[in-house]
Design a protein with these regions (language model features):
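Bacterial Sec-dependent N-terminal signal peptides
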Residues: 1-30
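Signature for the C-terminal beta-barrel architecture of outer-membrane proteins
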Residues: 23-30, 35-57, 66-67, 71-73, ...
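A short acidic, glycine/proline-enriched capping/turn motif at secondary-structure boundaries
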Residues: 82, 108, 117-119
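Acidic, small-polar-rich N-terminal luminal/periplasmic segments of exported/outer-membrane proteins
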Residues: 94, 118-121, 127-129
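Phosphate/ribose-recognition catalytic cores of enzymes acting on nucleotide-derived substrates
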Residues: 98
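Outer-membrane beta-barrel pore proteins
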Residues: 116-120, 146-148
């Protein structure tokens, strides 16, 4: 199958100003972007690969955000006419998928509608968008953040994650807290912080699973330590992902219960023209899903950080590594 690809990214410098009859004129402004990823497919006689029936695929995104002082409101329209080959099948047709309103100042913010968030490295929880992979698990609900003198940071979320073009029935509730000892003690050349998060996931379960002792909710938590001094960095994270239930027919049991957990350690040094990074981790049953048992590649509620470097402008650096949800590396 031969592909003729058209990629367009249009940044719309849309700026509108609203002036008030006050000494302090406050201005609002609008920003927007439009992206289309369109491919025309042709049959490939050499490989005998056949193109789709309509020979066409197009992923399109229109994003608009309006800012007025501490307030912001935004929408995102997506159209898959049809979705490109290899992308999740649940992405189809056109729909207003994301919309939000928020208020934020220096130390406090609140958002209602869709939002993205991450706890720690993302092993416990991450909602994000990656258009090249067809991923968007934005949460529809509410988010609250607070920062006290860069000493204490707090995030609290509640909502339902997006799956495909709609929002799932699964509910997530979580809180993440960071405490900076170095800021509290006014250390000049050292940074030390202790962080932790907790996440509750709720999804209705089948009668069979309930009869075998399954629960519709799972509770996970994480603990993290970050240290930096004179070019040296050290980061450690422990994650308990909560109970997972898997289809498992053995000894009259339909499901197997597993406890998800992970350990992550990152060490680094940068200075004097030298940079070194060492990463070690252990993962066990760390696949966190929006909809239990759904095999879609977009059915993700967390993120397993890659072990390989993330750039490919040098051929010698192109050694991709696919993260697994159960491994020691």
């Amino acid at each position: 199958m031969t592909k003729i690809r058209i990629q367009v990214l249009a940044l719309l410098a849309l700026t509108s100003t609203l002036t008030y009859a006050q000494e302090d004129n406050k201005k609002g402004y609008l920003t927007g972007s439009f992206e289309t990823n369109t491919i025309y497919y042709k049959d490939d006689s050499k490989t005998e690969a056949e193109s789709p029936e309509d020979h066409f695929g197009s992923n399109n995104y229109l994003k608009l955000d309006y800012y007025q002082g501490k307030f912001a409101v935004g929408v995102q329209l997506e159209a898959y006419e049809p979705v490109l080959v290899g992308y999740p099948a649940e992405l189809e047709k056109a729909k207003l998928t994301n919309y939000y309103v928020s208020w934020a100042d220096k130390d406090f913010s609140v958002t209602a509608g869709t939002f993205y968030e991450q706890f720690g490295s993302g092993l416990l929880f991450r909602s994000w968008e990656d258009r090249m992979l067809g991923l968007n698990n934005a949460v529809m609900g509410a988010r609250f953040t607070y920062n006290y003198k860069n000493i204490v940071g707090l995030k609290a979320i509640w909502g339902t994650p997006r799956f495909g073009m709609d929002f799932s029935d699964t509910q997530v509730r979580g809180i993440d807290v960071s405490f900076s000892l170095s800021e509290m003690l006014s250390w000049q050349n050292t940074s030390l912080s202790i962080e932790g998060g907790a996440l509750n996931r709720y999804e209705k379960i089948s009668i069979d699973l309930e009869e075998e002792g399954g629960k519709p909710y799972s509770n996970g938590f994480s603990g993290r330590v970050n240290f930096e001094r004179s070019g040296f960095t050290a980061k450690g994270e422990y994650v308990d992902g909560g109970n997972k239930y898997y289809d498992f027919i053995h000894d009259d049991k339909l499901y197997a219960k597993k406890r998800a957990n992970a350990q992550l350690l990152e060490l680094g040094y940068s200075g004097n023209g030298l940079g070194i990074n060492l990463t070690g981790r252990r993962l066990e049953w760390m696949n966190s899903e929006i909809i239990a048992g759904n095999g879609s590649t977009s059915n993700l509620l967390n993120y397993v950080p890659a072990m390989s470097t993330q750039y490919t402008y040098m051929l010698t650096n192109l050694h991709p590594h696919t993260p697994q949800t159960g491994e020691v590396t």
